[in-house]
């Protein structure tokens, strides 16, 4: 009789640990051009460099991404023999693409953020990159800026 109760408790605890997807879309009561201007100003303030974008869109990148914006898991590296060591992310990068489309006198804003980090395998004197998982923090900052 205990097993079902323990199993239920385990599932409830596990569900409490799960994070939902980051909110990356919102409708804002402003024209799309104004929304993109607000988000662009926020990206500039955060140290992003804007790259060419299409009308109704904005693209930017940063080579100094903050750890609060994404979770970069440690990586297990080796030398090909028996030696293994865990390494942490070093330099972090972020790329953001923002679109703002007209939506009945408002703007439908969508933010697509991608993160990656450099890792160093000191055993082989080699570097590599891995993707990192968003925390939703950057997206929330940009959506707040979109609202003014």
Regions found by a protein language model. Give the residues of each.
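Bacterial N-terminal signal peptides that target proteins for export
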Residues: 1-7
């Amino acid at each position: 009789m205990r097993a079902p109760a323990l199993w239920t408790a385990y599932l409830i605890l596990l569900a409490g640990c799960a994070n939902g997807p980051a909110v990356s879309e919102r409708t804002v009561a402003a024209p799309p051009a104004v929304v993109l201007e607000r988000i662009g100003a926020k990206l500039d303030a955060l140290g992003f460099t804007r790259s060419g974008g299409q009308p109704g869109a904005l693209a930017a990148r940063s080579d100094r991404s903050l750890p609060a914006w994404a979770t970069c898991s440690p990586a297990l590296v080796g030398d090909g023999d028996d030696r293994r060591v865990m390494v942490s992310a070093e330099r972090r990068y972020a790329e953001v693409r923002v679109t703002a489309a007209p939506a009945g006198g408002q703007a439908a804003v969508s933010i697509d953020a991608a993160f990656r980090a450099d890792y160093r395998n000191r055993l082989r004197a080699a570097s590599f990159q891995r993707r990192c998982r968003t925390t939703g923090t950057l997206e929330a900052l940009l959506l707040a800026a979109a609202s003014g």
